């Protein structure tokens, strides 16, 4: 997204929770594995990658209080309609399931994936995208942020199917941290999938759009293909989760952790 409204944080910090762990409703779903296509993949299609790199794009929105629900629906439907631009590998937008940790009061999320940075750039300036931002997003949102990164070695479905749960984590690092510390953080997050079998996919990388990211420089997405029940199973392993968090906690200045369930096309609106 090109729109960014930088406002003062609306919440005090919650407890730092830099790695993928949470709980709540269960939405189990099955996913099917197909060959990696050369064309666009819709927001509900699932295909597999045999160790590939994708460009991740996540936008967080705070809808103004007391906004007419019909206008919120229009925004969500407009964002999901951007799959028609034939530039995305995957795109989903809708209300957040839960805020685990954040100094900001975000309400909605857009997650999309692209083959290349050029595809993301083309999406960003596309008239269809700009129209949705101008007509449906800016009039009802008083805060927006976006983070972009390249996820290398990603395997599994490129497009999580409806009912899949994702945990989005953004990390703001303490000043003057060296490359060694950044590398350690990235390796710890990459290793989560091997320690928690419920995590179906981990995408992590360094943000390459700093102007829009409020100072958050490392981002990750943990995908739970069978839904929130898998997320809850991971959250129940408190001691193991604490061990992983403690490995990087000293490097962190601020953390955003948000949970989201990929909606069906019919239920994407709020």
Where are these regions (language model features)?
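A short mixed-secondary-structure module that forms the rim of ligand-binding clefts
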Residues: 125-129, 133
């Amino acid at each position: 997204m090109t729109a960014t409204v930088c406002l003062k944080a609306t919440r005090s910090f919650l407890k730092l929770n830099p790695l993928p762990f949470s709980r709540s409703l269960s939405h189990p779903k099955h996913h099917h594995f197909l060959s990696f296509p050369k064309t666009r993949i819709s927001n509900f299609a699932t295909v597999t990658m045999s160790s590939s790199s994708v460009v991740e794009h996540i936008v967080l929105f705070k809808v103004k209080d007391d906004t007419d629900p019909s206008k919120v629906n229009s925004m969500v439907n407009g964002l999901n309609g951007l799959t028609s631009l034939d530039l995305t590998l995957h795109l989903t937008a809708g209300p957040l399931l839960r805020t685990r940790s954040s100094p900001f009061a975000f309400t909605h999320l857009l997650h999309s994936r692209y083959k290349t940075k050029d595809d993301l750039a083309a999406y960003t300036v596309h008239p269809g995208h700009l129209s949705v931002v101008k007509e449906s997003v800016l009039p009802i949102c008083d805060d927006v942020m976006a983070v972009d990164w390249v996820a290398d070695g990603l395997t599994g479905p490129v497009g999580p199917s409806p009912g899949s749960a994702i945990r989005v984590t953004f990390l703001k690092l303490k000043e003057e941290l060296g490359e060694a510390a950044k590398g350690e953080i990235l390796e710890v997050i990459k290793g989560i999938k091997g320690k928690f079998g419920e995590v179906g996919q981990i995408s992590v990388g360094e943000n390459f759009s700093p102007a829009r990211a409020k100072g958050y420089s490392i981002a990750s997405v943990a995908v739970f293909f069978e839904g929130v029940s898998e997320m809850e199973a991971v959250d129940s392993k408190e001691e193991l989760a604490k061990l992983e968090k403690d490995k990087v906690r000293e490097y962190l200045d601020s953390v955003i952790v948000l949970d989201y369930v990929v909606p069906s096309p019919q239920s994407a609106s709020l």
